Structures are given as structure tokens and as C-alpha cells.
């Protein structure tokens, strides 16, 4: 990818720098927001300038690291005044409260919760601020490096599993897949979760095409030939972000509206064989919280006999909550639903309209009566009955003969 969601300069372990891509401005504007404090981390997560469960956990953790290093190196800074730095126990008390505040930015995403629990454990066992800084730095680096490695594993696990299933079913042709929201490089440390599987499927398809063209392999076999990303209202992560990643990677794709899924399945010239979605939280029985619209996609896939897969690392699995009924679903500001935010386009020639600094102008356009009541949940819960498999870095988990997932080995 030409864009990184998170830029983490770790060349000086005791003086790191962090900036995150403002994803609200994509695909037309590239702007990075510096992260110096926990307040900065809270702000970019809450405003959805950064999104995607893995990326949220990484940015949240990095914001703790940058704040700790800021108060250590600059004890007279504004944020340092929140702490009693001469007393380590008092400092730990304030930090714990700050971590709770950070968690409130996105309570549905279990990755952030898990990371902050781990940071609290590190804090508890640290003898002073310097020791905490060093241990926290090591933890954050490991979190980022493992996320990227696990994304690659998930991609390959999911691609291999789907190809094997299609071959067992006797399918030997080109197929298409569906996806919702954004689960790629912009939602993670790189490569992606659900979009990572799609990337691996595309690599597999290119390899098979090369073999066939060279005459090394004339046997027909299943290969992914097209992707249908959903626009993903109301924040349009599919049209703004996933479409951008697919275009950049030159993966054949066609953007569709959230309301056209069923008709696209019925009329697609290439048979749609699977849907891959990410997850913000998977509970013990496999029920999954993900971007609003995921449930309707799962229901439609069930109706048409299309395989529906959730792709997420182990860190997204909540080993305490039993069912999706107990997941707290965040509701967004109703006003976000009444407007569309985008880049201003010249209606005559389709070019971007720029400001005096040469940057594209963004604006909001009202699309609903201001007086109308709005329900705007950020997520929905897909019951495990509608999920055919959960793809992790450990492999693909399917349901037993009783129709239940057994995720205990991941806990």
C-alpha cells in the first residue's frame, strides 16, 4: 500500500513518534495527525479518524506510550500537570484512570480493551516510570509486529480453506467474493484481516493464471476473479477505504450499495461464493459484533447458500462474554446520519475543488430532515448460526455436529 494507517518511528526507543492517517479525508486527501497524548489517541478513535479493531488497539497503546514519554521528558508539559510525578503510586492511579478514559472511546472493540488490560498489568508490576516506559515500549512493538505477521497467516489460512472447500464441491471456475467496511492495511498494521484473505486469494489467482499461461498447468481450478465491496453506510468505509485499497492493488472490483447485495448475487455474471468480514468482538459462542450491515449480509448469504466467514486475530475473541446478547453496542451521534461528508467536486468536469493552500475542500451535505429521529448504531451482532467459519492466525474454526463453535483452544 502507498498509505500507512499508522506511522510509528521507533528508531529512538525512549523518544518515539507516532502519527495516524486521517481516514475521514480519504480517498482524496492524505493528512497525518500526530499523537502525543492519550487525549490525542481518544480523539482520533472517537472521531473515527482511525478505525478497525486492530488499528484502534495499536493507536490506543501508542498514545499511552507517547504520553508516558512526554511526561518523563517534559515534566512541565500540560499533560504532566495531571500527574504527581514525585509519587509513583499516585502516578499509577492517574494512569489507570487515563486508561479507563481511553477505553471509553470505543467500548465495543475488544482489541482495545485487551491491550489496555495488558498495559494495566505492566503498570502494576513496574517499579517506576522509567521501568514502565521500557516495558510498555517492548509490548507495543510486539503488538504491532505480531499483528502484521498474524494478518499474513490469516490471509493464507482463509484463502487455502475456501479453495479447498470449492474444490471438494467440484467447482473449478472463476468466482467472486463480498466484503463490508474496511479490513485492510488501513484498519491494521498492514495487509489486513478479511481484506487480507482477499489479497491472498488474488495472489493465488495470479499464480494460477501465470502457470496456465506458461503451459505448466492446464487443469481448471477455482480462482477469485472479482470482489464486490459494500459502500458501508453511514461512514462509507467501503467506498472511501476498501475501494481505494482494491484499486491500488489492481484487484478487479465493483463497488455496490448496501441495499443491492441480494440483487447483485442473483445477477452477477461471476458466481459469488463467499463473504469475508472482520470483527470488533467475537464472544465465546462465536456471535460476532462488526460494522452495522454485517448482520444483513450474513442473512442474505444464508438465503443464497453463500459461505460467510469472519476473519479476526485471537485478540478479537472475548473469552469472558458468553453470547452476543451481552455485547455493548456503541451508538453514534444521530447527526452523523443526517449528513454526508465528502470532498467537493466541480460538477462541470469532475475535478477536485481546492482551497488557497492547494488542498481539496471537504464539506457536509444534509440528506435528511433535521427534525427526523435517527437510530445510528455503529455495529450489529451476527449470531454464530449464520457464520460458516472463523478464520484466525491459528487456522479456520468451523462448527461441530451440534452447530456450535469450539473456540476454547484459543483462550
Swiss-Prot record:
The keyword Metal-binding does not apply. The modification N-acetylserine is found at residue 2. It is found in: Cytoplasm; Nucleus. It comes from Saccharomyces cerevisiae (strain ATCC 204508 / S288c). Keywords: Acetylation, Amino-acid biosynthesis, Cytoplasm, Isomerase, Methionine biosynthesis, Nucleus, Phosphoprotein. Its main location: cytoplasm. It is an enzyme of class 5 (isomerase). The lineage of its organism: Eukaryota, Fungi, Dikarya, Ascomycota, Saccharomycotina. InterPro entries: IF-2B-related (IPR000649), IF-M1Pi (IPR005251), IF_2B-like_C (IPR042529), Initiation_fac_2B_a/b/d (IPR011559), M1Pi_N (IPR027363), NagB/RpiA_transferase-like (IPR037171). The keyword Zinc does not apply. Catalyzes the interconversion of methylthioribose-1-phosphate (MTR-1-P) into methylthioribulose-1-phosphate (MTRu-1-P). The modification Phosphoserine is found at residue 351. The active site is at 280 (proton donor). GO terms for cellular component: cytoplasm; nucleus. Pathway: Amino-acid biosynthesis; L-methionine biosynthesis via salvage pathway; L-methionine from S-methyl-5-thio-alpha-D-ribose 1-phosphate: step 1/6. Pfam families: IF-2B. This is Methylthioribose-1-phosphate isomerase. Present with 922 molecules/cell in log phase SD medium. Its EC number is 5.3.1.23.
